């Protein structure tokens, strides 16, 4: 039999093992896995390379429309492809207007036409002002709903994102549970974090360590505990976003042991950066929850290897450089990171700490696809989309600003020596990024809607 594509001689990450085996693709799908698969129009030799499922990044901010000067579909999805991401799940905030109903999500679809290098699923927003319109987003096909119990949004802009209070969260979660949807939550105690931050500013405490102290671990843990209880009472699946502390992970683990339907994610920056590095890097490493100390980081690695964290995500949330000016307490909080999720974590988790390749595949792709119902994504298996990434192990390089595809070529990882490289990214059987030839085909990404799964 003749196929469109055969990948030969690579070490392939399968669900429960990794071994040297060939992959055949036909019509954008994985058609066969094995040896001596026959002929193909295109044959790629992956000798010495790891062949991974394309990353499913379940937490990405593309600020188009309305704030395209922060990040746009063209630049953001090219960076994703260069970093081995083949599917992103896009957050409903940072763009203007926020994605809170049918009209605003249609604006996203229109803005992205002809610009998607990778595939994209959408999240709707659960905000203080759209409880009567959640069904519109469900009908369009979002794969989940994001909300904040921490303070968010520009109060001077009417159609910006807004956090929810406990009543709004509970009522929204009730509605979403009835729709068989998942609610995703940014968990920090709004009032305490706000007051601690204002107190620090008044007293002139504006260093990285001061910022971290203004958002202590207990503010994350309290919020996680609260939304777990409310989501359970409301009858809604819960996904806890970007957990930064082992104590926060323990709350999720405890709830799972009590048979609550809950999952969680974390981000590479919580595993590879610490507060001292944050102080050195400056505002480019500011995010919330904040990057914490080495002892906290050690605990996060233990939770990751124990299987208590479901997936790793970028939380890519860039902004124009001028918004990172000034002291750390004043600067915008958000990290530009999606281009370096896979290579950094392959280096740190697999090469330096001995994580198995199947576990790496689950954390970067499989689990996120399962959590959000992306049935064609996240696995190297017959019938799945042929979304694949070639990783060259033990191949060190120093990340430079000019390597970045973002609209603004800045990242807290610039200057870092990374011990692995993404050499090729394949989306539905077509090479969309190659380390030698760049981006060889026009953007072919498409939106993934829940009801089409």
Swiss-Prot record:
**UniProt-recorded name of the protein:** Allantoinase
Tell me what PTMs the record reports for this protein: Carboxylation allows a single lysine to coordinate two zinc ions.
Q: Mind telling me which GO cellular component terms the entry cites? A: cytoplasm
Q: What is this organism's lineage?
A: Bacteria, Pseudomonadati, Pseudomonadota, Gammaproteobacteria, Enterobacterales
Q: Which NCBIfam families match?
A: allantoinase (TIGR03178), PRK08044.1 (NF005960)
Q: Write out the pathway annotation from the protein's UniProt entry.
A: Nitrogen metabolism; (S)-allantoin degradation; allantoate from (S)-allantoin: step 1/1
User: Which family is this sequence assigned to?
Assistant: Belongs to the metallo-dependent hydrolases superfamily. Allantoinase family.
CDD domains linked to this entry? L-HYD_ALN
